[in-house]
Amino acid sequence: MVIRGAVYRVDFGDAKRGHEQRGRRYAVVISPGSMPWSVVTVVPTSTSAQPAVFRPELEVMGTKTRFLVDQIRTIGIVYVHGDPVDYLDRDQMAKVEHAVARYLGL
C-alpha cells in the first residue's frame, strides 16, 4: 500500500516516445492511499523541466522540484520502489491538486 502525498522513487520504463518522462525518478502519489489497489496514480517530478502554470515548484528533500502535472500517469504498484523519500504537507498537496484540476479543466 502506498501513501497519498508521499514521494516515491518510480520506474517509468525506457520507452522513448516524445517528451514523456522515463527511467527512475521521483513522483508523488495522488490516488487514494487507503485502498490496496494494484495501480496507483502519480505525478512525476523534474528538477530541470520548464516552468508552467500547471507545474508547481515545491521542495523535495531540500531541492526545488517541478511536479509535472501534464505527465500524470497511472502505473502498476510494482513500479513504485521502496519507502517514501519525502512527504508533501497539506499546503504543498493542495498546490499539486489545484494544478491537476487546472490542467484537466475541472
UniProtKB/Swiss-Prot annotation:
Gene3D superfamilies listed in its UniProt record: 2.30.30.110
Pfam families for the chain: PemK_toxin (PF02452)
GO molecular function: DNA binding; RNA endonuclease activity
Entry keyword set: Toxin-antitoxin system
InterPro entries given in the database record: PemK-like (IPR003477), Plasmid_toxin/cell-grow_inhib (IPR011067)
GO biological process entries: mRNA catabolic process; rRNA catabolic process
Subunit and interaction comment: Forms a complex with cognate antitoxin Rv3098B/RVBD_3098B.
Family of this protein: Belongs to the PemK/MazF family.
Function: Putative toxic component of a possible type II toxin-antitoxin (TA) system. Its toxic effect may be neutralized by cognate antitoxin Rv3098B/RVBD_3098B.
Protein's name in the database: Putative toxin Rv3098A/RVBD_3098A
Lineage: Bacteria, Bacillati, Actinomycetota, Actinomycetes, Mycobacteriales
